[in-house]
Amino acid sequence: MNKGNLIKNYAVALLNNAMVDNIQDKIFEEITSINRIITDNFDIREFLFSPIVNKNDKINAVNLLAKNIKISTIVQNFLLLLVKNSRTAILSNIVNAYNTLLYESKNIKIVQVISANKLQPKEQEWIKSRIEKELNQKTEILFDIDNTIIGGIVIKYDSMLQDYSIKGSLEKIKKALKTVNIAV
């Protein structure tokens, strides 16, 4: 099974378990929090991701972590399953896939907007309203900054990419100039 399908299968299983008790958002908050703790703490990350560390030690660590931060049984069992199957290294990917599935279940499209500088709240609202009008759907906008685009914005959703950046425009001009034969 390829990694993408594996990640999606884990995310779907977690979402289905959360739907039974109608706690999808709570589970997302918990799994995101756990992922942040693991990602931000080098020692915990190395311990859980290491193939050398005994699985029983990892299980004890997950149980201790669950007890200390009081997470649901669903998330605790899910983390234990990842440990038992040696899949803790893909937790971040599973969290992202879960997030996507959660928003899809609410008919909300996740859209990434990349700008060269931090956008003001009014600019963010304007962009959000334009995108929702274009897509005719509610959206969750993730605003990111990438100063290499020089100016403008890049919009990504599903497999679509709309490049309204200066860098993108310059690259299009460069490509067009390469295809033109100019006689001197």
From Swiss-Prot:
It is found in: Cell membrane. It is a peripheral membrane protein. The keyword Transcription regulation does not apply. Pfam families: OSCP. Keywords: ATP synthesis, Cell membrane, CF(1), Hydrogen ion transport, Ion transport, Membrane, Transport. One of its GO terms (molecular function) is proton-transporting ATP synthase activity, rotational mechanism. GO terms for cellular component: plasma membrane; proton-transporting ATP synthase complex. InterPro entries: ATP_synth_OSCP/delta_N_sf, ATPase_OSCP/dsu. Its main location: membrane. Disulfide bonds: none annotated. Belongs to the ATPase delta chain family. HAMAP family: ATP_synth_delta_bact. F-type ATPases have 2 components, F(1) - the catalytic core - and F(0) - the membrane proton channel. F(1) has five subunits: alpha(3), beta(3), gamma(1), delta(1), epsilon(1). F(0) has three main subunits: a(1), b(2) and c(10-14). The alpha and beta chains form an alternating ring which encloses part of the gamma chain. F(1) is attached to F(0) by a central stalk formed by the gamma and epsilon chains, while a peripheral stalk is formed by the delta and b chains. F(1)F(0) ATP synthase produces ATP from ADP in the presence of a proton or sodium gradient. F-type ATPases consist of two structural domains, F(1) containing the extramembraneous catalytic core and F(0) containing the membrane proton channel, linked together by a central stalk and a peripheral stalk. During catalysis, ATP synthesis in the catalytic domain of F(1) is coupled via a rotary mechanism of the central stalk subunits to proton translocation. This is ATP synthase subunit delta. It comes from Rickettsia africae (strain ESF-5). The gene is atpH.
